[in-house]
């Protein structure tokens, strides 16, 4: 009899704790119709991040509590992240931490390196000016026996999976390796 007086409250408290824990971390917190969405995050732009993610969340306040507890907000990374429908706050944070998703960059024959830079900049975070500077970098050109007239030859028309947050140098070096 005394055993039941202890067991019932302990079980009730445990159940309350488990339900609260589930609701806090794992209860679905997305509010969009598609099966998934892509979220573009810039590391040092907290206002844009808040604006872009808030429209996809049922509860922004609880998401930020979980994100803070999991140390995401202090360690936010730039990238393109896929968020699936019907996932909880914990899974959203894990997607934002670990699931940087590449974009498909396709280009055909370009007559000028400026055109190529403009085309690629539509798919990645960096602008065409930054890409053009990387393509025309004197040290890079010298090290690879290239010049401004023939640098376009390293860009083979095709489709490539590139991370949205790739630097111009990363992209250029990837094209050289291809």
Predicted regions and their residues:
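Conserved catalytic or metal-liganding residues and their short signature motifs at active sites
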Residues: 2-178
């Amino acid at each position: 009899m005394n055993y039941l007086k202890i067991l019932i409250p302990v079980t009730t408290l445990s159940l309350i704790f488990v339900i609260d824990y589930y609701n806090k971390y794992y209860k679905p917190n997305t509010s969009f119709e598609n099966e998934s969405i892509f979220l573009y995050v810039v590391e040092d732009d907290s206002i844009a991040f808040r604006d872009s993610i808030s429209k996809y969340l049922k509860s922004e306040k609880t998401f930020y509590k979980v994100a803070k507890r999991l140390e995401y907000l202090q360690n936010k990374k730039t990238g393109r992240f896929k968020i699936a429908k019907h996932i909880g706050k914990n899974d959203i944070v894990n997607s934002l931490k670990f699931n940087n998703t590449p974009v498909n960059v396709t280009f055909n024959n370009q007559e000028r390196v400026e055109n190529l830079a403009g085309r690629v900049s539509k798919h990645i975070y960096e602008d065409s000016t930054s890409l053009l500077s990387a393509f025309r970098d004197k040290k890079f050109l010298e090290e690879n026996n290239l010049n401004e007239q023939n640098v376009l030859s390293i860009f083979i028309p095709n489709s490539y999976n590139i991370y949205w947050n790739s630097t111009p140098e990363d992209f250029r070096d990837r094209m050289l390796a291809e």
